[in-house]
Amino acid sequence: MLSFSVKNVTKELLSELPERSRRVLIDRFGLSGKGESRTLDAIGQEYGITRERIRQIENHGLSTVRDSDAYETHAPTLEDLKRALNALGGVLAEETVLREIAKNEGDHNHIVFLLTVGHHFDFRREDADFKTRWHIDEQLAEQVEQALSALYESLETNRLTPEDEFLQLFAKHLKQQGVKNRPDDVMTRWLLISKRVGKNPLGEWGRQESPHVRIKNTRDFAYLTLKRHGSPMHFTEVAK
């Protein structure tokens, strides 16, 4: 989906930074070959300074990157990333962004860095209702989250709904928030933002806390299959 190498872009964006700032950003975002991000405390201990000082270095480093010639050079690159997010729905769980646009797992941290440094993108931290997510339109993000909350409240605790019907129900709540005529694939990605609705292995949606959605083991799956068919089934049929 992306027309550029995210690793090459991050390398060039970091190239104009002072050595310590560059190292801090590499460690914080896991941009080295190992791909492991480090905590503020761990980096602070290495340099013999406080975690708050590391945070200041990190924030200053990001600001410096945004003001750099390299950032201006890569403006079309970040626009390409913005177009990719917009095509996917404009409001996405971070895990969805990475699954949809990363060429491989090694690109994940580099994409998160570009989202963080790019002025086009806004971040919302994981909370009780929603996963970590990114958006390019503040109003749309609010509308989608309001619709997801209303959708959850409208559901009976243990009721399961086929995906096509569930999307129709979600579309009604979106329309009430002023969001109309969105493709099913976009609405499905928006559903994945929520931590309170989910889909079981049979493709049926409902409240995440329902035992019919949160399948824990083979016995739960067998029960769900029998319940769906509404009649006794041989074990080999359930196993399929």
Task: Show where each model-derived region lies.
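C-terminal non-catalytic scaffold/interaction domains in large multidomain proteins
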Residues: 1-240
